[in-house]
Regions:
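Active-site pre-lysine segment of PLP-dependent enzymes
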Residues: 12-35, 40-73
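PLP-dependent enzyme catalytic core of the Aspartate aminotransferase-like
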Residues: 20, 175-178, 185-213
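Conserved PLP-binding catalytic core of the aspartate aminotransferase-like
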Residues: 129-130, 143-176
Length: 213
């Protein structure tokens, strides 16, 4: 059996596959005995989770597993808390039989329960990210020197079209106390691509000013 992994929404492009596209992939992989791991670490940031999450497909396919965590949406990377969703009970039983004991510590277990019950935080965060993401894309899309890609996660991929390199833009932002990602190290992206995360509105405004100089 082969294993194929996919990140949805994707990092660093922030693009996403919808459930129809995922269904085609899973169908093809099943025919070729390929097990698929779908990383949905950023899925909570998506405008409409149901249109891109593969959770609904766990009752139809047994050749894939969804991976999620709390490091991004809940800003808790130190907890090392993640979880999987899978409709293949035999696969889950096999995993449980060989996994290390105590894979989740007591603090992470308690924090995890509190996080997922905090519906106010969840909705407020989703609303803020969606609002600021849309605002930033609208502003940047009006600039001829930038190409903005559709975003489903909490970050936006930008291509610089005026000859400025991603490293030069990175340095410009660092000097202003702002951090962006130079995407030159990502396979398939050259020195013209940057990625930035949605932050506080005032920081977003500072970054927008730098990008539109």
């Amino acid at each position: 059996m082969c294993i194929r992994d996919s990140c949805n929404p994707n990092n660093p492009t922030s693009s996403a596959l919808n459930t129809e596209e995922i269904t085609k992939i899973l169908t093809h992989c099943k025919l070729h005995d390929i097990f698929v791991m779908i990383d949905e670490t950023y899925v909570e940031f998506a405008p409409d989770i149901d249109t891109i999450s593969a959770v609904s497909l766990t009752t139809k396919f047994d050749n894939f597993m969804i991976l999620r965590g709390t490091s991004k949406f809940f800003c808790a990377p130190g907890l090392r808390l993640g979880y999987g969703i899978c409709g293949n009970l035999a696969f889950l039983e096999r995993m449980n039989s060989i996994k290390n004991p105590w894979t989740v510590n007591t603090l992470a277990a308690l924090a995890g329960e509190a996080m997922f019950m905090d519906t106010d935080y969840i909705q407020t965060t989703k609303d803020y990210i969606q609002s600021e993401r849309t605002r930033c894309i609208d502003i940047l899309s009006k600039r001829d020197n930038l190409k903005i890609y559709p975003a489903y996660a909490n970050f936006i991929l930008v291509k610089l079209l005026d000859g400025t390199t991603s490293f030069e833009m990175f340095e410009r932002c660092i000097k202003s106390g702002l951090m962006i990602r130079d995407c030159a190290s990502f396979h398939g992206l050259d020195g013209e691509f940057i990625r930035f995360c949605i932050q506080k509105k005032e920081d977003n405004d500072r970054l927008l000013n730098l990008l539109t100089l």
